[in-house]
């Protein structure tokens, strides 16, 4: 027996390894794996079901079918272990060896491996420098290829068809060698001298000029170097020996009725063996060449189908017309080996059931049905029963459990005590989709779930199911309790706000109990303390909403942690006083002295967590829930039809609108307005009417008249049930109430256009058939959208997780002082996100000074918490440089300082936190809430009148940012730069609003001037683009000849004449080359120069420009000499929602992207080519001018002679992130992408912390492109990992050599995932074949640094608690100790890690 145990123990030995290398297998290697050659295509005998000898299931080769029993039955039992039977040749061993023993097939003719041939770029093609077409013609026996030309005129690698071959034979005889088929390819590959070729290529590359050629050569060079470095030989890409998979991995199972269920691989192997044997026979018989050739081609095709069916030609199908599943299909795709078995395993000790509400549970509990618990905890129960002596053997214990004896239930209760279980609800979109609870045994068959965790699970009780998992080992239980317990997950990892927040009934109850009513019973009474209020309320002497005075004792926790007790009398209501009883000590009374709406409750829990800590908050949340449920029951709030009060004004508003529509219709009938104008006007009218109705309705609903104590009639907030539900945030919104009690309003057709006739009825009045029919469009589209959205959102999450999976916090501080400049996010004059919110939980990168002084008020390295935020706001700082994941210099992973606060815990992030995955989940999880639509700007939205002035909302001081301006004679300023901004700061100097100022805007205030709210500080004409002079003088016209380059127009109304410049295509031949311009000269006629330059002041006029001055006129500074009419931009669809987020993360270049200036300098326009304008920028530093061709239809914002800075917008359009990175750098790119993505989420009301987006962005910026190789081994134009390049440059700098220079590259998330260092991670993501082919050829090593790779090889992940295990192993590896780490050592390392992380 002992022997057996030792044997089993040895079987379980795991090889310890630190990297996995993938490469090409040489024929010798394949033979060394093999336990014999498969010679026959037979599988098993259909009568005896015994494997045939030398066949695909041969027991001699692969091992016995039954444990320790040879095939003929001569040797049985364990004692003969290792004996080889002399009769049948089978070794006596475990049948399990049939899963690991391989065989081989000796191929009669070499066969090219289809992956290296067809997987683009073709590796065989690159090495041989032949096209794929040519190689295929050789392989499939259509042409000869010259292998050795000898002394003839032929060239090596030249293709010959049959005729040419026979001609060559006649001419040269046997002086040359030309063959066909895979052996020819193998010969050519064998003949390649890698070292010589590499040397030749390295010399050739610097001498080539054409870009494409350099690309091709460097591709070849890279491949050759990869082969040389990996020890792979090129000829191994052609197989001479084919390995055979162990038979238990391609099973053949007899079904009843004499049929067999078989793996497709057996069919594919059978074809290969049949053709191979036939070919051997033909070669022995020395058959005619043409027959042999055909057989060889068929063998090649059979092997192709086995390796990757359907890659070349039509897929081979089985009897049922279904393509056979080849080896490649086994590993790729969702059902392949990687995603189905290695990354997604099924879990034992688990069960699932429907969930129902457990309103009496505490937050850390869940109700578990007894039946389930009994099954899940079986082994524990067996153990306990034996330990107690209630059962003697496991078998007896099993019987007891099956009979469900009473003592079993006692034991179960004991086993379950303090043994947490994990609850999971699919889809698990973020880490809060699996949490740990302590089970409470319940009768019934449904799992009970605590209502407050529903938000995290996104669960509801309409039939949702959840799975239960039991953590078995002590470590697992410890982690479940310490890290995954629901009480430890109060804050959301996405934004750091509480996620355990009451909703619906609870909110309604709390809101109801904290509302005040006028003249309620007991109003105006004064109470000594809360207990008295409680007694009086219970006795029915005071109503819940009565306004009272009460004396309270509150304890308030101060900033420094000291506790202040004070007693005061407050004006409040009975309900609020009752609610204060459950508020933990440390929070002031003011937190409950308001109507508790959803937002207020969320804020309250957040404050509670920050002030009094986790434990108190959990107890408080539970109490809040119980209170809320109790009072929502007492309130009896429910909806009746009479609650939907329809406003009296509705009929009048709709009547007026109908009349106006009739008026427009008659205008249309008489031809005064066009169809489009009519449509737009009507839709505008109805949306206005709709708004009026809903305003009237809300005014009606939200107030009610009551009599106060003096008998006067006063208004108070309404107690209408529906209004209370919406107002409290429990359910419903103004928009929904509008449909119930106002009017449904305008409906859209499925294509997104709005139907002109709105639904004037509401749901209380009921819809007519037509109205109902119109409204079905929208409902149906909604359902279709939702289905698509879920899939798209899931795929986005998967790509995000894949790109960021290996990003883990690996050190405390990387020591960089780089960072992002944070400013308040201001849009159209509103502060969308104040600075405080943006820097909360971040580390300051550089000292912050008090404005206007040199005093450091926030030192670098400070982690900004809520108190610092208040401090920063008080000192009115408007920009701070903070550390960011994008700038972190940690090599593998990221440092805690650059990441900042762990949002779900509220302190600095611990080492080992998997911040990449958290970021991906935080961005992906709300994906289902985003819309799928692309918004058409049409109807009401498109005609928000173009902005033509800046009107200040709040008063304050004017600040002008990077604005070039000139002062006009009347004292006003005129903007002459395009990127200028005007900001308004309050009395503390904090920016409150910010506006863009276009070129030519007239500004009526100066820097530092005080303005009142509502003042208009700047004006411009939105429909024309002015050309403004920057100096005074006399105008002279150059090249402006009437009817050749210009034409005069007289305005009929005003009688003024304008000069219009003709478009080039409208000019007569004489004017084609002339470029009209306006030149400025002084009184004596000498040229004037632009201020500060030696460029003459000459303004070239583009087509259609209108000139408003006469030749020889005197003009002053800042006057407008010409205007260019701007057609209002054609309506662009804005991509919104999920597709927009995906576009940004995939770094897709937008269509018609904006054009940015490549260099700083002066603009000029060169000669026009067909349909394009030539833009020339002459740099200020005197280097070569930069030229670019721009299509004519692009509208440019710049003029001849104007100065631009690098990265300034020349032509409007959506921004291209690649351009921003190239011209403006990483910080500008980060700012752009973060703001764009946040805009999409903000529109849906979803909050995500910026750092998650930055974390993903860091992964997209991993690669760099080498621009100068210096003394490094890199090739110019190569894409390399940034870390690799930095390591190499450090080495070169240490040896005083030239370092390589590089530019950052932005990759989309899919591309970034596929180009990761780990091939296991990339292969399990997408394009498995391509990734593995590339990895094998280059002999890649995977150092298993990421999470995915470690999951695949079945190890603890190097994150969280697994990091301790990995760092311990690394320590041992460095110290050359044995690598097996025992549990106790891991525990020691863990304790140390936990102690060092400071909490």
Swiss-Prot record:
Cofactor note text: Binds 1 Mg(2+) ion per subunit. Binds 2 Zn(2+) ions per subunit.
NCBIfam families documented for this protein: rpoC_TIGR
Binding site for Zn(2+) 1: 70, 72, 85, 88
Class of the enzyme per the UniProt entry, highest EC level: transferase
Residues given in the record as Mg(2+) binding sites: 460, 462, 464
Cofactor(s) listed: Mg(2+); Zn(2+)
CDD domains, per database record: RNAP_beta'_C (cd02655), RNAP_beta'_N (cd01609)
E.C. no: 2.7.7.6
The species this protein was found in: Pseudomonas putida (strain ATCC 700007 / DSM 6899 / JCM 31910 / BCRC 17059 / LMG 24140 / F1)
Gene Ontology cellular-component annotations: DNA-directed RNA polymerase complex
Domain of life: Bacteria
The protein, known as: DNA-directed RNA polymerase subunit beta'
Residues binding Zn(2+) 2: 814, 888, 895, 898
Recorded catalytic activity of this chain's protein: RNA(n) + a ribonucleoside 5'-triphosphate = RNA(n+1) + diphosphate
KW S-adenosyl-L-methionine (keyword) present: no
InterPro entries in the cross-refs: DNA-dir_RpoC_beta_prime (IPR045867), DNA-dir_RpoC_beta_prime_bact (IPR012754), RNA_pol_asu (IPR000722), RNA_pol_N (IPR006592), RNA_pol_Rpb1_1 (IPR007080), RNA_pol_Rpb1_3 (IPR007066), RNA_pol_Rpb1_3_sf (IPR042102), RNA_pol_Rpb1_4 (IPR007083)
Protein's GO biological process: DNA-templated transcription
């Amino acid at each position: 027996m002992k022997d057996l145990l030792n044997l089993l123990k040895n079987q379980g030995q795991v090889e310890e390894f630190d990297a996995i290398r993938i490469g090409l297998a040489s024929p010798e290697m394949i033979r060394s794996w093999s336990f014999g050659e498969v010679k026959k295509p037979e599988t098993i005998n259909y009568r005896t079901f015994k494997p045939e000898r030398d066949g695909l299931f041969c027991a001699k080769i692969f091992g016995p079918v039954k444990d320790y029993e040879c095939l003929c039955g001569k040797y049985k039992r364990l004692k003969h272990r290792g004996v080889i039977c002399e009769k049948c040749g089978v070794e006596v061993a475990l049948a399990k060896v049939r899963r690991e023993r391989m065989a081989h097939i000796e191929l009669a003719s070499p066969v090219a491996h289809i992956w290296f041939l067809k997987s683009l770029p073709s590796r065989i093609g690159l090495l041989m420098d032949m096209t794929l077409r040519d190689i295929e013609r050789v392989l499939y026996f259509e042409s000869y290829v010259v292998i050795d030309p000898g002394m003839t005129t032929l060239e090596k690698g030249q293709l010959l068809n049959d005729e040419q071959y026979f001609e060559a034979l006649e001419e040269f005889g046997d002086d040359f060698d030309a063959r066909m088929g895979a052996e020819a390819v193998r010969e050519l590959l064998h003949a390649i001298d890698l070292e010589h070729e590499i040397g030749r290529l390295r010399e050739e590359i610097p001498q080539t000029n054409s870009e494409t050629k350099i690309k091709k050569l460097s591709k070849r060079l890279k491949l050759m170097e990869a082969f040389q470095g990996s020890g792979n030989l090129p000829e191994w890409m052609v197989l001479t020996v084919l390995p055979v998979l162990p038979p238990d991995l391609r099973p053949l199972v007899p079904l009843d009725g004499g049929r067999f269920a078989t793996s497709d691989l057996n069919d594919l192997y059978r074809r290969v063996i049949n053709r191979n044997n036939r070919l051997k026979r033909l070669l022995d018989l020395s058959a005619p060449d043409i027959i042999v050739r055909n057989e060889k081609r068929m063998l090649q095709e059979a092997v192709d189908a086995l390796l990757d069916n359907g890659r070349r030609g039509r897929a081979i199908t089985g009897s049922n017309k279904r393509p056979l599943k080849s080896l490649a299909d086994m590993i790729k795709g969702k059902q392949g080996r990687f995603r189905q078995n290695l990354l997604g395993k099924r879990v034992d000790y688990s069960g699932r059931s429907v969930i129902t509400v457990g309103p009496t549970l505490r937050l850390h509990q869940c109700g578990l049905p007894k039946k389930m618990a009994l099954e899940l905890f079986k082994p524990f129960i067996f153990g306990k029963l034996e330990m107690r002596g209630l059962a003697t053997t496991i078998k007896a214990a099993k019987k007891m459990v099956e009979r469900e004896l009473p003592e079993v239930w006692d034991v179960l209760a004991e086993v379950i005590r303090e043994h947490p279980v994990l609850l999971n609800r699919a889809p698990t979109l973020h880490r809060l989709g699996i949490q740990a609870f302590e089970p409470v045994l319940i009768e019934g068959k449904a799992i009970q779930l605590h209502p407050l965790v529903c938000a995290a699970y996104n669960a509801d009780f309409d039939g949702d199911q959840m799975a239960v998992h039991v953590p078995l080992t002590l470590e697992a239980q410890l982690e479940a309790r310490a890290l995954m317990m629901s009480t430890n997950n109060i804050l959301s990892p996405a934004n750091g706000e509480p996620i355990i927040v009451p909703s619906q009934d609870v909110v309604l109850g709390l809101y109801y109990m904290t509302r005040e009513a006028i003249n309620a019973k007991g109003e105006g009474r004064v109470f000594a303390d809360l207990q008295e209020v409680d007694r009086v309320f219970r006795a029915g002497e005071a109503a819940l909403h009565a306004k009272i005075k009460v004396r309270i004792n509150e304890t308030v926790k101060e900033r420094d942690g000291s506790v202040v007790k004070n007693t005061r009398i407050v004006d409040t209501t009975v309900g609020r006083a009752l609610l204060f009883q459950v508020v933990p000590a440390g929070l002031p009374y003011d937190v409950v002295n308001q109507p508790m709406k959803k937002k207020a409750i969320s804020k309250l829990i957040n404050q509670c967590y920050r002030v009094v800590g986790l434990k108190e908050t959990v107890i408080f949340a539970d109490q809040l829930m119980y209170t809320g449920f109790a009072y929502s029951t007492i309130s009896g709030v429910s909806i009746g039809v009479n609650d939907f009060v329809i406003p009296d004004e509705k009929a009048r508003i709709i009547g007026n609108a109908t009349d106006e529509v009739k008026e427009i219709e008659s205008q249309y009938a008489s031809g005064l307005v066009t169809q489009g104008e009519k449509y737009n006007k009507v839709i505008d009218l109805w949306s206005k009417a709709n708004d009026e109705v809903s305003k009237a309705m809300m005014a009606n609903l939200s107030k009610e008249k009551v009599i106060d104590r003096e008998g006067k009639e006063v208004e108070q907030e309404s107690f209408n049930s529906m209004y209370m539900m919406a107002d409290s945030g429990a359910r419903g919104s103004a928009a929904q109430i509008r449909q119930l009690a106002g009017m449904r309003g305008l409906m859209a057709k499925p294509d997104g256009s709005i139907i002109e006739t709105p639904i004037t009825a509401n749901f209380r009045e009921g819809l007519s058939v037509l109205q109902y029919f119109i409204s079905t469009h929208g409902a149906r589209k909604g359902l279709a959208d939702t289905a698509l959205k879920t899939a798209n959102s899931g795929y986005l999450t998967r790509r995000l997780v894949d790109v960021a999976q290996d990003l883990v916090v690996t050190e405390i501080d990387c020591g960089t002082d780089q960072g992002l400049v944070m400013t308040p996010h201001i849009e159209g004059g509103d502060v969308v996100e104040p600075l405080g919110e943006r820097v909360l939980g971040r580390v300051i990168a550089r000292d912050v000074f008090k404005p206007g002084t040199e005093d450091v008020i926030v030192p670098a390295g400070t982690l900004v918490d809520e108190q610092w935020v208040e401090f920063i706001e008080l000192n009115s700082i408007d920009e701070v440089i903070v550390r960011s994941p994008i700038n972190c210099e940690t090599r593998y992973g990221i440092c805690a300082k650059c990441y900042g606060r762990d949002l779900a815990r509220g302190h600095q992030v611990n080492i080992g936190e998997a911040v990449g995955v958290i970021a991906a989940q935080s961005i992906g999880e709300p994906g289902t809430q985003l819309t799928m639509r692309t918004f058409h700007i049409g109807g009401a939205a498109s005609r928000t009148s173009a902005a033509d002035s800046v009107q200040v909302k709040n008063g304050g001081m004017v600040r002008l940012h990077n604005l070039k301006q000139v002062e006009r004679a009347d004292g006003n300023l005129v903007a002459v730069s395009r990127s200028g901004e005007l900001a308004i700061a309050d009395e503390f100097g904090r920016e409150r609003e910010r506006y863009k100022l276009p070129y030519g805007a007239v500004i009526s205030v100066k820097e530092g001037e005080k303005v009142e709210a509502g003042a208009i500080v700047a004006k411009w004409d939105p429909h024309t683009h002015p050309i403004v002079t920057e100096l005074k003088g006399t105008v002279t016209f150059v090249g402006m000849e009437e009817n050749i380059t210009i034409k005069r127009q007289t305005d009929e109304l005003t009688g003024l004449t304008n000069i219009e410049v003709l478009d080039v295509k409208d000019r007569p031949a004489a004017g084609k080359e002339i470029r009209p311009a306006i030149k400025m000269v002084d009184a004596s006629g000498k040229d004037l120069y632009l201020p500060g330059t030696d460029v003459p002041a000459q303004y070239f006029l583009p087509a259609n420009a209108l000139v408003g001055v006469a030749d020889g006129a005197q003009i002053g500074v800042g006057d407008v000499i010409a205007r260019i009419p701007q057609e209002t931009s054609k309506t662009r669809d804005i991509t919104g929602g999920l597709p927009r987020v995906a576009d940004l993360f995939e770094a897709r270049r937008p269509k018609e992207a904006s054009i940015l200036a490549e260099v700083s300098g002066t603009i000029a326009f060169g000669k026009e080519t067909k349909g394009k304008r030539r833009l020339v920028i002459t740099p200020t530093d005197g280097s070569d001018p930069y030229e670019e061709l721009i299509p004519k239809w692009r509208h440019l914002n710049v003029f001849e002679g104007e100065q631009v800075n690098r990265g300034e917008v020349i032509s409007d359009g959506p921004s291209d992130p690649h351009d921003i990175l190239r011209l403006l750098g990483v910080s500008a790119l980060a700012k752009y992408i973060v703001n764009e993505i946040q805009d999409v989420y903000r529109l849906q009301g979803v909050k995500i912390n910026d750092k998650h987006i930055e974390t993903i962005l860091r992964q997209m910026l991993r690669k760099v492109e080498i621009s100068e190789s210096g003394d490094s081994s890199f090739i110019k134009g190569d894409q390399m990992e940034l870390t690799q390049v930095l390591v190499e440059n450090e080495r070169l700098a240490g040896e005083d050599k030239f370092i390589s220079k590089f530019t950052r590259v932005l990759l989309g998330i899919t591309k970034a995932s596929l180009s990761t260092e780990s091939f296991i991670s990339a292969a399990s993501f997408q394009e498995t074949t391509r990734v593995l082919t590339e990895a094998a050829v280059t002999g890649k090593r995977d150092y298993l640094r990421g999470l995915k790779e470690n999951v695949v090889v079945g190890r603890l992940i190097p994150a969280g608690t697994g990091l301790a295990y990995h760092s311990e192993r690394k320590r041992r590896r460095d110290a050359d100790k044995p690598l097996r780490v025992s549990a106790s050592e891991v525990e020691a390392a863990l304790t140390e890690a936990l102690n060092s992380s400071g909490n």
